[in-house]
């Protein structure tokens, strides 16, 4: 009988230990994790704007006048809550009703549009304060007071983009956000002042599409954003779409130097990264002009597929 009690006690202790260990290993939400920098984002690259014709580059208005660029700035539907527990959980679904939501301007911080409070501090963390009953503890940030803004809007892809690649770009969102198109999670980003892009070609529908962002005021990334400035939140830079051919210039690098013997002759070097179907070569040409627009050099060349 004594052995039975001891065995029962040991089993109970083992169960409690396993439960405690399981509770201890619960993963942090992405916005609390220093490892969750981004998900499914395209690799960073130099700005490469697509045009219908090379002559369009010279036209007034720049890349925004390209037929393969679409701004998503303007009025978005918006819901704001004081903490993550109260956020609308499935607002990103196209069937979700947002008729009672307010409108908000994008780009624009939500504190500047009637939601929450802008906080100014110098070199300290704005959430390391008695007001939030929180002491800094990286990577954790206050949860009960971590405001969440839910953004939604619709868009239609131009007919001329059919059969082409389509990319969504968010130039700057503070501090952490998830993004969906037509109810499908594209990924997330935790770099407030850096652009993030996702290829949305395969999730688009003919007709109306729905894009949604769930934005958190604070994240583990906030520990890297402590400087003398106003602490604000929301979509504060441009949001847009652009379209490229299936085979496209993904990046390029220009470098200039002088010959190593006399240091008189200039050396121009251009590296171009082409992505897309690798079965065919790419025809590329570059033109070198001075500040007045005078053409000095034009060079066509062909890139070969690389395994």
Residues covered by each model-derived region:
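Short, polar loop/linker segments at the starts of domains and inter-domain junctions
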Residues: 86-97, 114-124, 255
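Bacterial Sec-dependent N-terminal signal peptides
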Residues: 1-25
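Hydrophobic alpha-helical membrane-insertion signals
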Residues: 25-104
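Short beta-strand segments of immunoglobulin-like
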Residues: 254-261
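Accessory beta-strand-rich segments of carbohydrate-active enzymes
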Residues: 26, 30-38, 59-63, 77-81, ...
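Structural beta-strand segments of beta-rich domains
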Residues: 164-166, 264-272
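Short flexible loop/turn segments that cap and initiate beta-strands
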Residues: 89, 280-286
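Residue-level structural signal for beta-strand termini and adjacent loop
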Residues: 82-84, 90, 191, 254, ...
């Amino acid at each position: 009988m004594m052995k039975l009690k001891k065995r029962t006690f040991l089993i109970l202790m083992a169960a409690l230990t396993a439960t405690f260990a399981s509770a201890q290993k619960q993963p942090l939400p992405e916005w609390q994790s220093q490892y969750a920098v981004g998900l499914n984002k395209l690799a960073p690259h130099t700005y490469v704007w697509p045009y219908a014709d090379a002559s369009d580059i010279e036209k007034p208005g720049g890349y925004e006048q390209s037929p393969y660029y679409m701004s998503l700035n303007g009025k978005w539907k918006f819901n704001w809550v004081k903490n993550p527990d109260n956020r609308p959980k499935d607002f990103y679904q196209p069937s979700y009703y947002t008729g009672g939501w307010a409108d908000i301007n994008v780009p624009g911080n939500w504190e500047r549009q009637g939601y929450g409070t802008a906080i100014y501090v110098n070199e300290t963390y704005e959430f390391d304060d008695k007001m939030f009953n929180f002491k800094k503890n990286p990577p954790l940030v206050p949860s009960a007071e971590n405001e969440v803004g839910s953004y939604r809007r619709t868009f239609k892809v131009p007919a001329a983009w059919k059969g082409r690649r389509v990319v969504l770009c968010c130039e700057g969102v503070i501090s952490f956000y998830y993004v969906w198109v037509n109810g499908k999670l594209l990924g997330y980003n935790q770099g407030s002042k850096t652009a993030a892009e996702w290829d949305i070609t395969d999730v688009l529908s003919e007709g109306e599409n729905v894009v949604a962002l769930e934005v958190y005021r604070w994240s583990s990334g906030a520990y890297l954003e402590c400087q003398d400035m106003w602490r604000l939140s929301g979509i504060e830079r441009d949001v847009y779409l652009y379209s490229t051919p299936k085979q496209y210039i993904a990046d390029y690098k220009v470098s200039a130097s002088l010959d190593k013997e006399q240091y008189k002759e200039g050396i121009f070097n251009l590296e171009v990264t082409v992505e897309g179907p690798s079965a065919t070569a790419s025809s590329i040409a570059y033109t070198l002009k001075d500040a007045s627009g005078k053409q000095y050099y034009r060079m066509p060349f062909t890139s070969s597929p690389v395994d």
